[in-house]
UniProtKB/Swiss-Prot annotation:
Its EC number is 2.9.1.1. It comes from Methylocella silvestris (strain DSM 15510 / CIP 108128 / LMG 27833 / NCIMB 13906 / BL2). Its cofactor is pyridoxal 5'-phosphate. The gene is selA. Converts seryl-tRNA(Sec) to selenocysteinyl-tRNA(Sec) required for selenoprotein biosynthesis. SUPFAM superfamilies: PLP-dependent transferases (SSF53383). This is L-seryl-tRNA(Sec) selenium transferase. The modification N6-(pyridoxal phosphate)lysine is found at K295. Pathway: Aminoacyl-tRNA biosynthesis; selenocysteinyl-tRNA(Sec) biosynthesis; selenocysteinyl-tRNA(Sec) from L-seryl-tRNA(Sec) (bacterial route): step 1/1. Coiled coil: none annotated.
Amino acid sequence: MEGSSSGRLRDLPSVDAVLKAPAALAMLERFGRAASTDAVRAALADARAAIAGGASHAPDAAVLARAAEASLEADELSNMRPLFNLTGTVLHTNLGRAVLAEAAIEAAVAAMRDPVALEFDLETGKRGERDDHVRALLCELTGAEDATLVNNNAAAVLLCLNTLAAGREAIVSRGELIEIGGAFRMPDIMARAGAKLVEVGTTNRTHLKDYRVALSAQTGVILKVHTSNYRIEGFTAEVGAAELAALAGQANVPLMNDLGSGTLIDLSRYGLQREPTVREAVREGSGLVTFSGDKLLGGPQAGFIVGARALIEAVNRNPMKRALRVDKIRLAAIEATLKLYRDPDRLAERLPTLRLLARPLAEIEAQARRLLPAAAVAVEPAYQVALRLCRSQVGSGALPLDTIESAGLIIRPTNGSRSLERLAGALRALARPIIGRIEDGGLLLDLRCLTDEAGFLSSLSALDADALA
Protein backbone atom coordinates (compact mmCIF):
# COMPACT_ATOMS: atom_id res chain seq x y z
CA MET A 1 0.00 0.00 0.00
CA GLU A 2 2.82 2.37 0.92
CA GLY A 3 4.56 1.72 -2.41
CA SER A 4 1.35 2.24 -4.32
CA SER A 5 0.83 5.56 -2.57
CA SER A 6 4.34 6.65 -3.50
CA GLY A 7 3.64 5.71 -7.09
CA ARG A 8 0.51 7.82 -7.20
CA LEU A 9 2.46 10.76 -5.78
CA ARG A 10 5.02 10.33 -8.57
CA ASP A 11 2.19 10.36 -11.09
CA LEU A 12 1.25 13.91 -10.12
CA PRO A 13 2.28 16.42 -12.82
CA SER A 14 4.63 19.30 -12.03
CA VAL A 15 3.45 22.86 -11.53
CA ASP A 16 4.89 23.77 -14.93
CA ALA A 17 3.10 20.87 -16.62
CA VAL A 18 -0.24 21.96 -15.19
CA LEU A 19 0.31 25.56 -16.28
CA LYS A 20 1.13 24.38 -19.82
CA ALA A 21 -2.01 22.26 -20.06
CA PRO A 22 -4.72 23.57 -22.45
CA ALA A 23 -7.14 23.63 -19.51
CA ALA A 24 -4.98 26.29 -17.82
CA LEU A 25 -5.05 28.80 -20.69
CA ALA A 26 -8.24 30.56 -19.61
CA MET A 27 -7.05 30.70 -16.00
CA LEU A 28 -3.74 32.28 -16.99
CA GLU A 29 -5.49 34.83 -19.18
CA ARG A 30 -8.00 35.77 -16.50
CA PHE A 31 -5.92 35.70 -13.31
CA GLY A 32 -2.30 36.08 -14.47
CA ARG A 33 0.69 33.77 -14.04
CA ALA A 34 1.58 34.61 -10.42
CA ALA A 35 -1.87 33.94 -8.98
CA SER A 36 -2.35 30.88 -11.22
CA THR A 37 0.97 29.40 -10.11
CA ASP A 38 0.06 29.79 -6.44
CA ALA A 39 -3.35 28.21 -7.07
CA VAL A 40 -1.81 25.23 -8.89
CA ARG A 41 0.63 24.69 -6.03
CA ALA A 42 -2.29 24.68 -3.61
CA ALA A 43 -4.21 22.22 -5.81
CA LEU A 44 -1.19 19.91 -5.91
CA ALA A 45 -0.85 20.13 -2.12
CA ASP A 46 -4.51 19.10 -1.79
CA ALA A 47 -3.94 16.20 -4.19
CA ARG A 48 -0.94 14.98 -2.18
CA ALA A 49 -2.98 15.14 1.02
CA ALA A 50 -5.80 13.19 -0.64
CA ILE A 51 -3.39 10.47 -1.81
CA ALA A 52 -1.87 10.26 1.66
CA GLY A 53 -5.41 9.80 2.95
CA GLY A 54 -6.06 6.88 0.63
CA ALA A 55 -7.21 8.39 -2.68
CA SER A 56 -7.06 5.71 -5.37
CA HIS A 57 -5.63 7.78 -8.23
CA ALA A 58 -3.63 10.92 -9.00
CA PRO A 59 -5.50 13.72 -10.83
CA ASP A 60 -4.09 14.72 -14.21
CA ALA A 61 -3.00 18.20 -15.30
CA ALA A 62 -6.44 19.15 -16.65
CA VAL A 63 -8.21 18.24 -13.40
CA LEU A 64 -5.65 20.15 -11.35
CA ALA A 65 -5.94 23.20 -13.62
CA ARG A 66 -9.72 23.22 -13.21
CA ALA A 67 -9.38 22.90 -9.43
CA ALA A 68 -6.93 25.80 -9.34
CA GLU A 69 -9.21 27.95 -11.49
CA ALA A 70 -12.21 27.14 -9.29
CA SER A 71 -10.31 28.23 -6.18
CA LEU A 72 -9.32 31.50 -7.85
CA GLU A 73 -12.93 32.13 -8.89
CA ALA A 74 -14.08 31.53 -5.32
CA ASP A 75 -11.45 33.92 -3.99
CA GLU A 76 -12.51 36.54 -6.53
CA LEU A 77 -16.01 36.70 -5.03
CA SER A 78 -16.16 39.66 -2.69
CA ASN A 79 -17.05 38.90 0.91
CA MET A 80 -19.18 42.04 0.69
CA ARG A 81 -21.07 40.90 -2.39
CA PRO A 82 -24.74 41.83 -2.76
CA LEU A 83 -27.30 39.58 -1.09
CA PHE A 84 -31.03 39.36 -0.53
CA ASN A 85 -32.04 40.59 2.91
CA LEU A 86 -35.18 38.55 3.59
CA THR A 87 -34.72 38.52 7.36
CA GLY A 88 -37.61 40.89 7.95
CA THR A 89 -35.25 43.41 9.55
CA VAL A 90 -35.14 46.42 7.24
CA LEU A 91 -32.13 48.13 8.84
CA HIS A 92 -30.12 45.00 9.60
CA THR A 93 -26.88 46.01 11.33
CA ASN A 94 -25.02 42.92 10.09
CA LEU A 95 -26.24 43.41 6.52
CA GLY A 96 -25.17 47.03 6.13
CA ARG A 97 -28.21 48.89 7.48
CA ALA A 98 -29.67 51.46 5.06
CA VAL A 99 -29.69 50.90 1.31
CA LEU A 100 -28.75 54.23 -0.22
CA ALA A 101 -30.89 56.31 -2.54
CA GLU A 102 -29.87 56.44 -6.20
CA ALA A 103 -29.01 60.12 -5.80
CA ALA A 104 -26.59 59.25 -2.99
CA ILE A 105 -25.00 56.44 -5.00
CA GLU A 106 -24.51 58.71 -8.02
CA ALA A 107 -22.97 61.42 -5.84
CA ALA A 108 -20.58 58.95 -4.19
CA VAL A 109 -19.48 57.55 -7.57
CA ALA A 110 -18.87 61.06 -8.91
CA ALA A 111 -16.73 61.87 -5.86
CA MET A 112 -14.70 58.71 -6.46
CA ARG A 113 -14.21 59.29 -10.17
CA ASP A 114 -12.99 62.91 -10.23
CA PRO A 115 -11.38 65.52 -7.98
CA VAL A 116 -13.94 67.44 -5.90
CA ALA A 117 -13.91 70.68 -3.92
CA LEU A 118 -13.74 68.84 -0.60
CA GLU A 119 -11.98 71.59 1.36
CA PHE A 120 -11.78 74.28 -1.29
CA ASP A 121 -13.93 77.40 -1.55
CA LEU A 122 -14.79 77.81 -5.23
CA GLU A 123 -15.85 81.45 -4.71
CA THR A 124 -12.72 82.71 -2.96
CA GLY A 125 -10.22 80.17 -4.24
CA LYS A 126 -9.06 79.60 -0.67
CA ARG A 127 -9.12 76.64 1.68
CA GLY A 128 -12.61 75.67 2.80
CA GLU A 129 -14.13 73.29 5.34
CA ARG A 130 -15.59 69.90 4.48
CA ASP A 131 -18.48 70.51 6.89
CA ASP A 132 -19.61 73.37 4.63
CA HIS A 133 -21.13 70.83 2.23
CA VAL A 134 -23.81 69.81 4.74
CA ARG A 135 -23.82 72.47 7.48
CA ALA A 136 -26.48 74.68 5.92
CA LEU A 137 -28.58 71.65 4.97
CA LEU A 138 -28.52 70.26 8.50
CA CYS A 139 -29.44 73.65 9.94
CA GLU A 140 -32.29 74.00 7.44
CA LEU A 141 -33.70 70.56 8.21
CA THR A 142 -33.34 70.74 12.01
CA GLY A 143 -33.71 74.41 12.89
CA ALA A 144 -30.30 74.39 14.60
CA GLU A 145 -27.90 77.35 14.66
CA ASP A 146 -24.94 75.27 13.56
CA ALA A 147 -24.00 71.71 12.68
CA THR A 148 -21.10 69.34 12.15
CA LEU A 149 -20.63 65.62 11.53
CA VAL A 150 -18.32 62.69 12.24
CA ASN A 151 -18.16 59.09 11.05
CA ASN A 152 -20.84 57.55 13.32
CA ASN A 153 -23.11 58.45 16.21
CA ALA A 154 -21.00 56.75 18.88
CA ALA A 155 -18.15 59.00 17.71
CA ALA A 156 -20.46 62.02 17.90
CA VAL A 157 -21.34 61.20 21.51
CA LEU A 158 -17.70 60.57 22.39
CA LEU A 159 -16.57 63.84 20.81
CA CYS A 160 -19.29 65.95 22.44
CA LEU A 161 -18.72 64.47 25.90
CA ASN A 162 -14.97 64.94 25.58
CA THR A 163 -15.51 68.56 24.54
CA LEU A 164 -18.03 69.46 27.24
CA ALA A 165 -17.10 67.24 30.17
CA ALA A 166 -13.51 65.97 30.01
CA GLY A 167 -12.34 66.01 33.63
CA ARG A 168 -15.80 67.09 34.74
CA GLU A 169 -19.11 65.47 35.65
CA ALA A 170 -21.81 64.32 33.24
CA ILE A 171 -25.26 63.81 34.77
CA VAL A 172 -27.49 61.11 33.26
CA SER A 173 -30.51 59.08 34.36
CA ARG A 174 -29.86 55.46 35.31
CA GLY A 175 -32.70 54.45 33.01
CA GLU A 176 -30.83 55.93 30.04
CA LEU A 177 -27.47 54.18 30.46
CA ILE A 178 -27.95 52.19 27.30
CA GLU A 179 -25.87 49.50 25.64
CA ILE A 180 -25.64 49.68 21.86
CA GLY A 181 -24.50 47.00 19.41
CA GLY A 182 -21.25 45.15 19.99
CA ALA A 183 -21.51 45.54 23.79
CA PHE A 184 -20.58 49.23 23.65
CA ARG A 185 -22.10 50.83 26.73
CA MET A 186 -22.80 54.49 27.40
CA PRO A 187 -20.81 54.45 30.69
CA ASP A 188 -17.78 53.09 28.79
CA ILE A 189 -18.04 55.81 26.14
CA MET A 190 -18.31 58.44 28.87
CA ALA A 191 -15.21 57.07 30.59
CA ARG A 192 -13.25 57.13 27.31
CA ALA A 193 -14.38 60.72 26.82
CA GLY A 194 -12.84 61.60 30.18
CA ALA A 195 -16.19 62.45 31.78
CA LYS A 196 -17.11 61.40 35.30
CA LEU A 197 -20.47 59.65 35.26
CA VAL A 198 -23.04 60.89 37.77
CA GLU A 199 -26.11 58.63 37.76
CA VAL A 200 -29.41 60.02 38.98
CA GLY A 201 -32.81 58.48 39.65
CA THR A 202 -33.57 54.80 39.35
CA THR A 203 -33.88 52.42 36.42
CA ASN A 204 -37.60 53.04 35.99
CA ARG A 205 -38.19 56.48 37.55
CA THR A 206 -36.19 59.69 37.39
CA HIS A 207 -37.46 63.14 38.43
CA LEU A 208 -36.31 66.70 37.81
CA LYS A 209 -35.26 67.06 41.44
CA ASP A 210 -32.78 64.18 40.93
CA TYR A 211 -30.94 66.24 38.34
CA ARG A 212 -31.16 69.40 40.41
CA VAL A 213 -29.60 67.75 43.46
CA ALA A 214 -26.76 66.33 41.34
CA LEU A 215 -25.74 69.70 39.88
CA SER A 216 -22.46 71.08 41.20
CA ALA A 217 -19.56 73.31 40.26
CA GLN A 218 -18.01 70.23 38.61
CA THR A 219 -20.93 69.59 36.27
CA GLY A 220 -19.86 69.80 32.64
CA VAL A 221 -23.04 68.58 30.94
CA ILE A 222 -26.48 67.13 31.51
CA LEU A 223 -26.95 64.19 29.16
CA LYS A 224 -30.29 62.90 27.93
CA VAL A 225 -30.27 59.65 25.98
CA HIS A 226 -33.24 58.54 23.89
CA THR A 227 -33.70 54.83 24.56
CA SER A 228 -34.40 53.99 20.94
CA ASN A 229 -33.39 50.32 21.24
CA TYR A 230 -35.60 49.39 24.22
CA ARG A 231 -38.60 50.57 26.23
CA ILE A 232 -39.29 50.57 29.96
CA GLU A 233 -43.03 50.30 30.59
CA GLY A 234 -45.28 50.23 33.63
CA PHE A 235 -44.45 52.29 36.73
CA THR A 236 -42.11 54.77 35.06
CA ALA A 237 -41.20 58.44 35.03
CA GLU A 238 -38.69 60.42 33.03
CA VAL A 239 -37.85 64.07 32.59
CA GLY A 240 -38.48 65.56 29.18
CA ALA A 241 -35.85 67.47 27.25
CA ALA A 242 -37.70 70.79 27.61
CA GLU A 243 -37.67 70.55 31.42
CA LEU A 244 -34.03 69.53 31.43
CA ALA A 245 -33.17 72.41 29.10
CA ALA A 246 -34.77 74.88 31.50
CA LEU A 247 -32.83 73.42 34.43
CA ALA A 248 -29.60 73.41 32.43
CA GLY A 249 -30.15 77.04 31.46
CA GLN A 250 -30.62 78.06 35.09
CA ALA A 251 -27.38 76.29 36.02
CA ASN A 252 -25.51 77.59 32.95
CA VAL A 253 -24.72 74.00 31.97
CA PRO A 254 -25.27 72.64 28.44
CA LEU A 255 -27.87 69.94 27.77
CA MET A 256 -26.78 67.25 25.33
CA ASN A 257 -29.50 65.07 23.80
CA ASP A 258 -28.47 61.82 22.09
CA LEU A 259 -31.37 60.70 19.89
CA GLY A 260 -29.60 57.54 18.72
CA SER A 261 -31.35 56.47 15.52
CA GLY A 262 -32.74 59.94 15.00
CA THR A 263 -35.30 61.03 12.43
CA LEU A 264 -35.88 64.25 10.51
CA ILE A 265 -39.56 63.55 9.85
CA ASP A 266 -42.70 62.43 11.65
CA LEU A 267 -42.75 58.68 10.98
CA SER A 268 -46.40 58.31 11.96
CA ARG A 269 -47.46 59.59 8.53
CA TYR A 270 -45.99 56.36 7.14
CA GLY A 271 -47.78 54.10 9.61
CA LEU A 272 -44.84 53.77 12.00
CA GLN A 273 -44.59 54.56 15.68
CA ARG A 274 -43.87 58.21 16.29
CA GLU A 275 -40.30 59.06 17.33
CA PRO A 276 -39.03 62.45 18.55
CA THR A 277 -37.60 64.39 15.63
CA VAL A 278 -34.32 66.24 15.65
CA ARG A 279 -36.11 69.54 15.03
CA GLU A 280 -38.23 68.97 18.15
CA ALA A 281 -35.13 68.24 20.23
CA VAL A 282 -33.52 71.47 19.03
CA ARG A 283 -36.70 73.46 19.65
CA GLU A 284 -36.96 72.09 23.20
CA GLY A 285 -33.64 73.72 24.04
CA SER A 286 -30.99 71.02 23.78
CA GLY A 287 -27.60 72.66 23.35
CA LEU A 288 -26.30 69.72 21.31
CA VAL A 289 -28.27 66.95 19.60
CA THR A 290 -26.57 63.84 18.19
CA PHE A 291 -28.09 61.26 15.82
CA SER A 292 -27.20 58.62 13.22
CA GLY A 293 -27.08 58.86 9.46
CA ASP A 294 -27.55 55.21 8.47
CA LYS A 295 -30.63 54.26 10.46
CA LEU A 296 -34.02 55.97 10.20
CA LEU A 297 -32.47 58.78 8.17
CA GLY A 298 -31.63 56.26 5.43
CA GLY A 299 -28.18 57.50 4.47
CA PRO A 300 -24.55 56.44 4.88
CA GLN A 301 -23.02 55.81 8.29
CA ALA A 302 -22.45 59.14 10.02
CA GLY A 303 -22.89 60.89 13.33
CA PHE A 304 -24.56 64.30 13.12
CA ILE A 305 -24.14 66.98 15.76
CA VAL A 306 -26.47 69.99 15.64
CA GLY A 307 -27.20 72.76 18.11
CA ALA A 308 -25.95 76.04 19.53
CA ARG A 309 -23.22 77.73 17.51
CA ALA A 310 -20.89 78.30 20.46
CA LEU A 311 -21.04 74.61 21.40
CA ILE A 312 -20.54 73.42 17.81
CA GLU A 313 -17.52 75.71 17.51
CA ALA A 314 -16.10 74.16 20.68
CA VAL A 315 -16.65 70.67 19.24
CA ASN A 316 -14.90 71.66 16.01
CA ARG A 317 -11.88 72.94 17.94
CA ASN A 318 -11.41 69.57 19.63
CA PRO A 319 -8.34 67.83 18.08
CA MET A 320 -10.27 64.55 18.29
CA LYS A 321 -12.60 65.83 15.57
CA ARG A 322 -10.00 65.31 12.82
CA ALA A 323 -9.61 61.64 13.75
CA LEU A 324 -13.36 61.14 13.38
CA ARG A 325 -14.10 63.09 10.21
CA VAL A 326 -15.84 61.61 7.17
CA ASP A 327 -14.22 61.10 3.77
CA LYS A 328 -15.26 62.69 0.48
CA ILE A 329 -17.19 59.64 -0.75
CA ARG A 330 -19.40 59.41 2.28
CA LEU A 331 -19.80 63.19 2.48
CA ALA A 332 -21.06 63.33 -1.10
CA ALA A 333 -23.63 60.61 -0.36
CA ILE A 334 -24.71 62.36 2.85
CA GLU A 335 -25.26 65.66 1.06
CA ALA A 336 -27.38 63.99 -1.62
CA THR A 337 -29.43 62.11 0.99
CA LEU A 338 -30.14 65.22 3.04
CA LYS A 339 -31.29 67.10 -0.06
CA LEU A 340 -34.03 64.51 -0.57
CA TYR A 341 -35.61 65.69 2.69
CA ARG A 342 -36.34 69.07 1.12
CA ASP A 343 -39.19 67.39 -0.77
CA PRO A 344 -41.06 65.38 1.91
CA ASP A 345 -43.99 64.61 -0.41
CA ARG A 346 -41.75 62.46 -2.64
CA LEU A 347 -39.37 61.23 0.04
CA ALA A 348 -40.84 57.71 0.25
CA GLU A 349 -40.40 57.30 -3.52
CA ARG A 350 -36.73 58.28 -3.44
CA LEU A 351 -35.44 56.98 -0.12
CA PRO A 352 -35.24 53.15 -0.07
CA THR A 353 -35.40 52.85 3.73
CA LEU A 354 -38.65 54.77 3.95
CA ARG A 355 -40.08 53.07 0.88
CA LEU A 356 -39.43 49.60 2.34
CA LEU A 357 -40.76 50.51 5.77
CA ALA A 358 -43.94 51.97 4.27
CA ARG A 359 -44.54 49.15 1.78
CA PRO A 360 -48.17 47.98 2.08
CA LEU A 361 -49.00 44.43 3.12
CA ALA A 362 -51.21 43.81 0.07
CA GLU A 363 -48.29 44.51 -2.26
CA ILE A 364 -45.95 42.15 -0.40
CA GLU A 365 -48.58 39.41 -0.18
CA ALA A 366 -49.22 39.64 -3.93
CA GLN A 367 -45.49 39.32 -4.53
CA ALA A 368 -45.36 36.20 -2.35
CA ARG A 369 -48.16 34.60 -4.38
CA ARG A 370 -46.31 35.36 -7.63
CA LEU A 371 -43.05 33.87 -6.40
CA LEU A 372 -44.42 30.80 -4.62
CA PRO A 373 -44.69 28.40 -7.62
CA ALA A 374 -41.14 29.01 -8.87
CA ALA A 375 -39.73 28.91 -5.34
CA ALA A 376 -41.43 25.56 -4.75
CA VAL A 377 -39.89 24.09 -7.90
CA ALA A 378 -36.42 25.24 -6.78
CA VAL A 379 -36.52 23.37 -3.44
CA GLU A 380 -38.72 20.34 -4.22
CA PRO A 381 -38.88 17.48 -3.37
CA ALA A 382 -36.76 17.89 -0.24
CA TYR A 383 -38.68 20.97 0.92
CA GLN A 384 -42.11 22.50 0.47
CA VAL A 385 -43.03 26.18 0.30
CA ALA A 386 -46.09 28.02 1.60
CA LEU A 387 -47.21 31.64 1.84
CA ARG A 388 -46.86 33.03 5.35
CA LEU A 389 -48.06 36.26 6.95
CA CYS A 390 -45.40 37.59 9.31
CA ARG A 391 -44.08 40.73 11.01
CA SER A 392 -41.10 42.82 9.96
CA GLN A 393 -39.12 45.14 12.19
CA VAL A 394 -37.18 48.35 11.63
CA GLY A 395 -33.88 47.13 13.10
CA SER A 396 -30.62 48.79 14.18
CA GLY A 397 -32.11 49.57 17.58
CA ALA A 398 -34.87 51.76 16.16
CA LEU A 399 -38.54 51.41 17.20
CA PRO A 400 -37.95 48.16 19.14
CA LEU A 401 -41.62 47.57 19.95
CA ASP A 402 -42.94 48.52 16.53
CA THR A 403 -43.41 45.61 14.13
CA ILE A 404 -44.95 45.88 10.68
CA GLU A 405 -47.38 43.52 8.95
CA SER A 406 -45.60 41.65 6.18
CA ALA A 407 -45.71 38.47 4.11
CA GLY A 408 -43.22 35.92 2.91
CA LEU A 409 -42.48 32.36 1.93
CA ILE A 410 -41.84 29.73 4.56
CA ILE A 411 -39.81 26.68 3.52
CA ARG A 412 -40.24 23.50 5.54
CA PRO A 413 -38.65 20.06 5.04
CA THR A 414 -40.92 17.35 3.65
CA ASN A 415 -38.98 14.94 5.85
CA GLY A 416 -38.75 16.14 9.44
CA SER A 417 -35.16 14.94 9.75
CA ARG A 418 -33.83 17.37 7.17
CA SER A 419 -31.93 20.30 8.63
CA LEU A 420 -33.11 23.88 8.28
CA GLU A 421 -29.58 24.98 9.12
CA ARG A 422 -28.36 23.03 6.09
CA LEU A 423 -30.91 24.79 3.89
CA ALA A 424 -29.94 28.17 5.33
CA GLY A 425 -26.29 27.33 4.66
CA ALA A 426 -27.03 26.39 1.06
CA LEU A 427 -28.81 29.72 0.54
CA ARG A 428 -25.88 31.59 2.06
CA ALA A 429 -23.48 29.77 -0.29
CA LEU A 430 -25.17 31.11 -3.44
CA ALA A 431 -23.32 33.59 -5.66
CA ARG A 432 -25.89 36.11 -4.47
CA PRO A 433 -26.81 34.79 -1.02
CA ILE A 434 -30.37 34.68 0.29
CA ILE A 435 -30.65 35.41 4.01
CA GLY A 436 -33.85 34.56 5.89
CA ARG A 437 -34.72 33.62 9.44
CA ILE A 438 -35.60 30.30 11.05
CA GLU A 439 -38.88 30.25 12.95
CA ASP A 440 -41.86 27.98 13.54
CA GLY A 441 -40.19 24.90 12.07
CA GLY A 442 -39.27 26.54 8.79
CA LEU A 443 -36.99 29.00 7.04
CA LEU A 444 -38.97 32.20 6.59
CA LEU A 445 -38.15 34.54 3.71
CA ASP A 446 -39.83 37.85 4.59
CA LEU A 447 -40.32 39.65 1.27
CA ARG A 448 -40.64 43.22 2.58
CA CYS A 449 -37.15 44.13 1.31
CA LEU A 450 -37.27 42.17 -1.96
CA THR A 451 -37.12 44.52 -4.95
CA ASP A 452 -35.45 42.24 -7.54
CA GLU A 453 -37.83 39.33 -8.14
CA ALA A 454 -36.01 38.02 -11.22
CA GLY A 455 -32.66 38.07 -9.43
CA PHE A 456 -34.15 36.28 -6.44
CA LEU A 457 -35.59 33.48 -8.58
CA SER A 458 -32.33 33.19 -10.51
CA SER A 459 -30.38 32.76 -7.27
CA LEU A 460 -32.90 30.29 -5.88
CA SER A 461 -32.80 28.19 -9.05
CA ALA A 462 -29.01 27.84 -8.64
CA LEU A 463 -29.43 25.83 -5.43
CA ASP A 464 -27.41 22.62 -5.46
CA ALA A 465 -29.82 19.67 -5.35
CA ASP A 466 -27.25 17.59 -3.48
CA ALA A 467 -27.07 20.25 -0.76
CA LEU A 468 -30.84 19.98 -0.29
CA ALA A 469 -31.06 16.19 -0.27
